[in-house]
Design a protein with these regions (language model features):
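Conserved N-terminal helical subregion
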Residues: 4, 46-178, 220-232, 373-374
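A structural signal for isolated positions on well-ordered beta-strands in alpha/beta enzyme cores
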Residues: 5, 28, 212-214
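Conserved mid-domain beta->alpha element of the FAD-binding
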Residues: 7-22, 26-33, 148-149, 175, ...
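Conserved N-terminal glycine-rich FAD pyrophosphate-binding loop of Rossmann-like flavoproteins
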Residues: 34-51
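Short, flexible helix/strand-to-coil boundary loops that buttress conserved ligand/catalytic motifs
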Residues: 40, 56-57, 64, 83-84, ...
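Conserved FAD/dinucleotide-binding core of flavoprotein oxidoreductases
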Residues: 81-105, 138-140, 180-257
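C-terminal domain-closing interface element
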Residues: 341-360
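C-terminal auxiliary extensions adjacent to catalytic cores
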Residues: 355-374
Length: 374
């Protein structure tokens, strides 16, 4: 393989580039923005994906903090469950981490170095015998043996493979934010979620004196014409004290809007010499806590297949055969998870009772599935 073109400099594209460079395979990333991802958000990366980053030499401790405990509060703010994520993660080889997305993006970008081209916006792709071609907004073009689309849920490259396909929007929206202080009420290395009918909220320790928090409504898209904080105050009752503390520490321009949309059962993920990975192929809800992990797992597997010396058709076919079931399962689980955490009073009562009385073996299996990606 003489050259791999990557469209998109997000987590998937950067991880793939580092993985290929480690194998000595030439790569170039074209990222449409002329800066690193500049909105301060964060996410949880489970143990199996952290191991991939660590194997690439990524110092994850510089961009986040290990997660030890995940605490869930159900109806009326009552505590219902604590999951010892840290101990279960370490049983499988690495901690799970709460990560500052901006810091991780900046770190990975610097590790990739000059092979990342910023301000290079792909507007179309094509494929000829033995080559994939990308055309850019400034009229220039680039070509490689293969082209890998890592350009996210609103992928431009997807139009080449599946013209007219759009995200399935779920009618859910909210905000996520990172604040430059640690809340006294939040224990170190802990994430808390608060589940109410029609809305869930969460807060997590990012380390380095930072906290991420988020709110997601089940059947409501936030209005741009109304105060963000007022929309939360008016629709989340009772408002958890932890979330109130977050609101008090956050300017509204720090609250990044989110909407839930996904792509289930899209197939194939490739055409000729062009392949999609990450959210370009299998976008999932931002409230699932699994999208970044799936992208990292995609990148690691694809790099191994490219390095194996197989033919391009075999690489693409084998990649989809291995990853599609897992990716579709993540999407289905994210839908179920949003429904579970925001269900109505009666179902919420049943849910809370089940979590409070769940056998330890069952709880451990749930945690094991999360930290291993199964």
């Amino acid at each position: 393989m003489k050259k791999v073109l990557i469209i998109g400099g997000g987590i998937a594209g950067l991880t793939l580039a580092l993985s290929l460079k480690k194998l000595g395979i030439p790569v170039v990333i074209h990222e449409k923005y002329n800066h690193y991802q500049n909105q301060k958000t964060g996410f949880l990366i489970w143990s199996y994906a952290i191991k991939i980053l660590q194997d690439l030499g990524v110092p994850v401790d510089e961009v986040g903090a290990p997660l030890e405990a995940f605490r869930i509060h159900g109806r009326k703010g009552r505590f219902i469950c604590e999951m010892p994520i840290g101990s279960v993660s370490r049983l499988h080889g690495a901690n799970s981490y709460e990560i500052n997305r901006y810091r991780l993006s900046e770190l990975l970008s610097k590790m990739v170095g000059d092979d990342l081209l910023l301000g290079s916006e792909c507007i179309s792709v094509s494929s000829i015998e033995g080559q994939a071609i990308a055309t850019f907004a400034d009229g220039s073009s680039d070509q490689g043996d293969i082209l890998i689309a890592c350009d996210g849920s609103n992928s431009v490259v997807r139009k080449f493979i599946h013209p007219g396909v759009q995200l399935r929007m779920l009618g859910s929206g909210g905000w996520i934010s990172v604040i430059d202080q640690r809340l006294p009420l939040l224990p170190l290395n802990t994430q808390m979620e608060f589940w109410q009918p029609g809305v869930k909220a969460g807060v997590a320790d990012l380390g380095h004196g930072e906290t991420r928090w988020y709110v997601a409504f089940k059947n409501y898209i936030p209005s741009a014409d109304e105060s963000k904080k007022d929309q939360i105050l008016n629709r989340m009752k009772p408002l958890p004290e932890m979330i109130m503390s977050c609101l008090e520490c956050t300017d509204e321009d720090q609250m990044v809007p989110t909407q839930a949309g996904d792509l289930l059962a899209l197939s194939p993920w490739y055409r000729d010499r062009v392949l999609m990975i990450g959210d370009a192929a299998h976008a999932t809800s931002p409230y699932a806590g699994m999208g970044a992990c799936s992208a990292i797992a995609d990148a690691a597997l694809l790099a191994d297949l490219i390095g194996s010396g197989r033919s391009v058709p075999a690489i693409f076919q084998d990649f989809q055969a291995v990853r599609k079931h897992a990716a579709d399962s993540v999407i289905k689980e994210s839908r179920r998870g949003l429904d579970l955490s925001t269900c109505g009073e009666l179902k919420g009562w049943v849910r809370d009772w089940m979590f409070m009385n769940m056998p330890e073996k069952k709880l451990n299996q749930i945690m094991t599935d999360m930290v291993t990606g199964h």
